[in-house]
């Protein structure tokens, strides 16, 4: 049986109203076991200052972002189940959900699904990559009981 080990780090000034650890686990389990047997993922929920700093340092973008993915690169010859880290900014996720008229829980789920696919090597830089990744995200979100996260863009 495939298993995802979750290391959840809540690094917000106010952690109230965040999804439960069991929800994060459910969202990870909907994605990762399809691709690899055992995995360990860290999800760190942060405020805008930390997201902004990481986004500037690692992507050269001078603003906070919804989710950053940091895949772990296993040295040659070693076998490790550590997949990587997701850093999710609480305030950006909450703002986007409100602006896009999406249920907050669904947007949290989407950020975990989206970030997990990045950890697994998916990307959306080129149009064909974006189509493949978005199709996978939609399939997983529907399987979790949420709407297509890209429905507004398709209308």
Swiss-Prot record:
GO biological processes: rRNA processing
UniProt keyword rRNA processing, yes or no: yes
GO cellular component, one term: cytoplasm
The enzyme's E.C. designation: 3.1.-.-
Keywords: Cytoplasm, Endonuclease, Hydrolase, Metal-binding, Nuclease, Ribosome biogenesis, rRNA processing, Zinc
Cofactor(s) recorded in Swiss-Prot or TrEMBL: Zn(2+)
GO molecular function: metalloendopeptidase activity; RNA endonuclease activity; zinc ion binding
InterPro entries: MetalPrtase_cat_dom_sf_prd (IPR023091), YbeY (IPR002036), YbeY_CS (IPR020549)
Localisation per UniProt entry: Cytoplasm
Origin superkingdom: Bacteria
Cofactor note: Binds 1 zinc ion.
The UniProt record lists the keyword Metal-binding: yes
Record-stated family: Belongs to the endoribonuclease YbeY family.
General function of this protein: Single strand-specific metallo-endoribonuclease involved in late-stage 70S ribosome quality control and in maturation of the 3' terminus of the 16S rRNA.
Protein name from the UniProt record: Endoribonuclease YbeY
Gene: ybeY
């Amino acid at each position: 049986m495939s298993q995802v080990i979750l290391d959840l780090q809540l690094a917000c000034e106010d952690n109230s109203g965040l999804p439960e650890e069991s929800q994060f686990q459910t969202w990870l389990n909907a994605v990762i076991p399809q691709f690899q047997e055992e995995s360990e993922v860290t999800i760190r929920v942060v405020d805008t200052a930390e997201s902004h700093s990481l986004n500037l340092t690692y992507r050269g973008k001078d603003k906070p972002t919804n989710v950053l993915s940091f895949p772990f690169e296993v040295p040659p010859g070693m076998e490790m189940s550590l997949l990587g880290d997701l850093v999710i900014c609480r305030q950006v996720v909450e703002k986007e959900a409100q602006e896009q008229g999406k249920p907050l829980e669904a947007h949290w789920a989407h950020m975990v699904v989206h970030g997990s696919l990045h950890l697994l090597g998916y990307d959306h830089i080129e149009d064909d990559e974006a189509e493949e990744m978005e199709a996978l995200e939609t399939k997983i979100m529907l399987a979790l009981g949420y709407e297509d996260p890209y429905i507004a863009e398709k209308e």
